[in-house]
Amino acid sequence: MKSRLLQRVPLKSTASLAGHPLRLRAVQTRAASSVSQRPNSDYVSFPGALKSAFTSQLKFESPESYNALPTYRVVDQHGTIVDSSFEPDLSEEAIVKLYKDMLFVSVMDLIMFDAQRQGRISFYMVSAGEEAVSVGSSSVLDPEDVIFCQYREQGVFKERGYTTKEFMSQLFANKNDSGKGRNMPIHYGSKRLNVHTISSPLATQLPQASGAAYALKLQRQQDPNSKPRVCVTYFGEGAASEGDFHAAMNIAATRGCPAIFICRNNGYAI
């Protein structure tokens, strides 16, 4: 750490103070202000190592030695509400609609997966077991919010109003497809629903989402009376291993972007 030289400013000339016991002298001090340099501090405190405890033992750390982050749940596997004080602020009609959307996605996945195996379409990916992730998260967003999906978010499209005809037109690449059949199956997109078209390369949607969120922030600054909007992006744990993931997080954090990152950890990655 660099040192700096602090000097007292004399009120009289240095010659007149030559024999004085409080004569001018150079004092060398440390320009340190972090908690780690303060007396009796047990932790390091600077960006990148917040609350990192000091230790005199050098050893390898294993992730298995730490407790995993807790998983929040509302109901158990039997459908029983875990927290009796929890009351959803949704009408019965809204809840039934969410269930129908999840059921639609599940049935469509079964039919279209078989169709792909029969050679009727060239490609398909299911979202079995992940229907609630996409449908539930999409239901709390506003229609004006911007979304970037990966390839298992059929539920997002269905919940926001993507029709059965639009699904089939995209999968079979006919003239009614918004992309005019120029894209692979399951690469849905809808300008009407504010959902960007899905792209094949893994994790490319993440920095794009951060950029879109930054644009929303700038629009809000230019027009403070406009409605606040957020940008949401979905990805899997495999995409979290890509460099684009870290770049996207860095952009969103340093720019203070209104971005929401939803990671699906299903234990599989391409």
Task: Tell me what each language-model feature is.
Residues 90-91, 226-229, 261-265:
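A short alpha-helix capping/helix-coil boundary motif
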Residues 97, 232-234, 267-270:
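A short, structure-level motif marking secondary-structure boundaries and short turns
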Residues 32-151:
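N-terminal amphipathic, basic-rich helices that act as targeting or association modules
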Residues 80-81, 154, 266-269:
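A short, flexible beta-alpha/helix-coil linker loop
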Residues 4-5, 260-270:
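Thiamine diphosphate
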Residues 70, 145, 184, 257-259, ...:
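Structural beta-strand/beta-sheet cores of well-ordered domains, especially the beta-sheet scaffolds
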